[in-house]
């Protein structure tokens, strides 16, 4: 990022000094957490899955043999991910996409026929799970798929012992923020990306 940008948290007292030097906000981003009880109530997530299943949408865990489909989904969507200096989404190549499974990530998704139209990628480390990304084909958005694949990933990781879930994104991606709030995530931190004034 160099010296062209600074990315303080919302409560950082340095923001006032940065603004006084002529830096301007060029992006906002957020982090959110979901905390489950030791004996978690997963009914909200199961209810989310039930609603889309009634609409004919089936969510399932994807095996590594679906890596090329995930790569094609990401390639179709890469231009739609908002960019900020603090929040970027880089398109993985086909080999790196396949390697997600080798690194222990789990992928929940759904298909329209043979076409993968939505997926979320999550990693669990003991009791903590972090969403890497969620991707839904443009033609399938506003159908509940994004919420459903994320709900499925939460159930899978919770059943394996995860109790704290993390995620984040750019403030410009209101749909992603809405998905996470619907599933019970709470915003825990915000960052502002400031760009230095022209010399």
Give the residues covered by each predicted segment.
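Acyl-donor binding region in acyl/amide transferases
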Residues: 1-17, 131, 139-152
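Acyl-donor-binding surface of acyltransferase catalytic domains
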Residues: 1-61, 194-196
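Conserved GNAT acetyl-CoA-binding A-motif
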Residues: 1-8, 157-169
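Conserved active-site alpha-helix within GNAT-family acetyltransferase domains
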Residues: 9-28, 147, 171-189
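Ligand-binding pocket scaffold of soluble enzyme catalytic domains
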Residues: 23, 30-39, 56-62, 66-72, ...
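Short amphipathic alpha-helix that is part of the acyltransferase structural core
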Residues: 46-89
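A conserved beta-strand-loop-helix scaffold within acyl/acetyltransferase catalytic domains
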Residues: 78-138
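Conserved glycine-rich acetyl-CoA-binding loop
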Residues: 137-148, 160, 172-175
């Amino acid at each position: 990022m160099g010296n062209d940008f600074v990315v303080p948290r919302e409560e950082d007292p340095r923001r006032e000094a940065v603004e006084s030097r002529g830096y301007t906000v060029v992006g906002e981003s957020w982090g959110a957490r979901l905390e489950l009880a030791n004996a978690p109530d997963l009914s909200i997530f199961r209810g989310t899955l039930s609603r889309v299943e009634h609409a004919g949408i089936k969510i399932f865990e994807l095996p590594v043999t679906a890596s090329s489909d995930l790569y094609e989904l990401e390639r179709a969507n890469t231009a739609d991910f908002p960019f900020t200096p603090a929040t970027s989404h880089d398109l993985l190549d086909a080999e790196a996409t396949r390697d997600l499974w080798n690194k222990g990530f789990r992928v929940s998704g759904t298909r329209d026929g043979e076409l993968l139209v939505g997926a979320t990628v999550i990693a669990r480390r003991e009791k903590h799970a972090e969403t890497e990304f969620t991707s839904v084909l443009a033609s399938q958005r506003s159908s509940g798929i994004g919420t459903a694949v994320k709900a499925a990933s939460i159930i899978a990781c919770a059943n394996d012992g995860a109790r704290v879930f993390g995620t984040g994104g750019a403030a410009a991606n209101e749909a992603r923020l809405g998905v996470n709030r619907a599933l019970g995530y709470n915003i825990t931190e915000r960052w502002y990306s400031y760009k230095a004034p022209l010399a």
